[in-house]
Design a protein with these regions (language model features):
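Bacterial N-terminal signal peptides that target proteins for export
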Residues: 1-9
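C-terminal motif of bacterial Sec signal peptides marking the signal peptidase cleavage site
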Residues: 16-19
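Bacterial signal peptide processing site
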Residues: 21-24
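Post-signal peptide N-terminal segment of mature Sec-exported envelope proteins
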Residues: 28-52
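Flexible, low-complexity segments enriched for small/polar residues
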Residues: 51-58, 310-345, 354-537
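N-terminal accessory alpha/beta regions
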Residues: 55, 61-163, 261-262
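Active-site substrate-binding loop specific to GH73 endo-beta-N-acetylglucosaminidase modules
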Residues: 70, 82, 97-100, 111-118, ...
Length: 537
């Protein structure tokens, strides 16, 4: 049954995101123009437009956030969001004290504390645009808590939050000497006598210049025979690695009360340079030279400067930010405009994120039916879950809101450095880029069904109470009439524009039951697997 549902949804998604374009950059026809900010934005922010923006720029619309966007307008809301201080996980000391894997009770306490605090940021933080940006960054600047544990995950999320609207050079420098990344990709204690190329390679391949040379529109440069031109060589990997040698996690000083002191105590601090282990030879990579005799800090700065100013990095980062915020298969013109902002501002992420969101292609769909052909993205499982909970006004982490054990995407815990899905994955039998589609499995659909109605079956509503959910409007609508509950579900989950056929499907999904909240929950369960909810278009 679930395989049939999955297949039907994929077909529907492909129909919603109709693609066209060439083999190298799939999307719409190349458009001519420079940065084009919100030329198509309506003068008054409608409910539909506000909800749509929040699907792109937050962890999901909530009634209060929709009202806020409508009050300030889209651009003013973005500007205000970018001025807010970062929300961070404020309990790393507890995580450190609890994270002793030899003690199962303390280990479980550590993981639960970490996950609840992380989920609180996703659900309830005021700086939702920053949080969404950090989420996107975490999906290509990858670590995994399976290796760095809960304390490392908390500190890495804090790092992303603190740098999400800063300069990309500063972000890469901070990541390069972050203990979580140093542990995950083996640059901690990397020395000139025994080079480990892991981080030096991934810093280029996944974090900056990529494997193949790109034009500004994201298309691949090719030689006369049509072969893709490689960005770097094995020699470049070695030279990059030499520039990164000599960094160690600082020696901890946390007293005798913390059992895992030696492993985790300084994960919240940058690694420190051991100049004796640093390679001071001159380095040549990507056509540039790093002078001999420099310190580990200076070599790192020189390396990052080479990578961030490389002509590939603008379109490389632009594509990943666009894919994570607005559309999986952006047009060449859209990529060009955002990449141009990246290059002109030398990697100012605040300006780049705003350019992604305010581009005319991103905002055209604020008028229903006006999205460019092929525009949109499939919501990944974690975003579906946070969108559900924010729509239901559930602001706190708890049994109900803890997605990590129940659903198929554990934030900051991808199985490999290549993330949960590759950015170049294409929908079946289509040229359409659809990375998140790879996570649409029968298991994932199965986990959506019954989640909300199951919570309402509990007569004590323990999960709902623990999560602080505000169910007043839902309860009133469910008790009033079918039309009232359909209208509320349309507002909360479909931007106020639920298709009529979807409404009929929701009504038909309800089992005979006298509890109006259970009925509402069954309808929401079904809403979660509809293409109209699962695709942000």
């Amino acid at each position: 049954m679930f395989l049939r549902i999955r297949f039907a949804l994929i077909i529907a998604i492909c129909a919603l995101l109709t693609a066209c374009g060439g083999a190298d950059r799939v999307g719409q026809a190349n458009l001519v123009g420079q940065v084009n900010l919100a030329a198509a934005a309506p003068s008054v922010t409608t409910y539909y437009a506000a909800s749509r923006l929040l699907e792109q720029a937050s962890m999901g619309p909530s009634p209060s956030s929709v009202a806020q966007v409508r009050k300030y307008g889209i651009e003013a809301w973005i500007d205000a969001q970018q001025k807010l201080p970062p929300s961070v996980i404020t309990t790393p000391a507890n995580l450190l004290e609890f994270d002793d894997q030899n003690d199962r009770v303390l280990a479980d306490l550590s993981w639960n504390t970490y996950r609840f605090n992380l989920q609180n940021i996703f659900l309830a933080s005021e700086d939702q645009l920053r949080v969404r940006t950090s989420w996107v960054l975490s999906n290509f600047l990858v670590i995994s808590t399976s290796k760095v544990k809960s304390y490392g995950g908390a500190e890495y999320m804090n790092l992303l939050q603190s740098n999400a609207f800063g300069n990309y050079s500063d972000l890469l420098k901070a990541i390069s000497i972050n203990p979580s990344m140093g542990t995950y990709l083996d640059n901690n204690q990397n020395n000139k006598w025994n080079l480990n190329e892991n981080y030096g390679r991934e810093l280029m391949q996944l974090f900056s210049v990529g494997l193949v040379q790109l034009n500004m529109d994201g298309s691949i440069k090719r030689d006369a025979n049509g072969k893709a031109l490689e960005t770097y060589t094995q020699s470049d990997v070695i030279e990059s690695t030499k520039a990164l040698t000599g960094w160690n996690i600082a020696t901890p000083n946390c007293g005798s009360t913390i059992k895992n002191c030696l492993n985790w105590a300084n994960y919240g601090k940058p690694m420190v340079a051991n100049e004796g282990a640093h390679n001071t030879d001159g380095k040549k990579l990507l056509g540039k030279t790093i002078p001999a005799g420099q310190t580990a800090v200076k070599d790192l700065e020189s390396l990052i400067e080479i990578l961030v100013t490389h002509p590939n990095t603008g379109p490389f980062v632009a594509l990943r930010l666009i894919q994570g915020l607005t559309t999986s298969d952006p047009s060449p013109a859209y990529i060009t405009r955002v990449a141009t902002v990246f290059q002109n501002t030398k990697g100012d992420l605040k300006a780049v994120v705003k350019a992604v969101l305010m581009d005319s292609e991103a905002r055209a769909g604020d008028v229903p039916g006006k999205s460019p052909a092929g525009f949109g993205r499939i919501k990944e499982p974690h975003l579906i879950n946070t969108s559900l909970l924010r729509a239901m006004e559930c602001p706190k982490a708890g049994t109900l809101t803890n997605t990590f054990n129940a659903w198929t995407q554990d934030p900051l815990n991808a199985k490999t450095v290549f993330n949960f899905y590759p950015p170049n994955h294409r929908a079946p039998s289509s040229k359409l880029l659809a990375p998140e589609q790879q996570m649409l499995t029968s298991e994932e659909f199965n986990m959506r069904l019954g989640r909300v109605s199951g919570a309402f079956w509990d007569p004590q509503a323990r999960g709902l109470i623990e999560a602080g959910c505000n169910l007043d409007a839902l309860s009133a609508a469910a008790s009033a009439s079918e039309s009232e509950i359909l209208n509320l579900i349309s507002q909360r989950f479909f931007r106020g524009a639920m298709p009529a056929v979807t409404g009929q499907a929701l009504l038909q999904s309800v089992n005979v039951n006298n509890n109006p909240l259970v009925k509402a929950g069954q309808m929401i369960d079904m809403a979660l697997i509809t293409p109209a909810f699962g695709v942000s278009k």
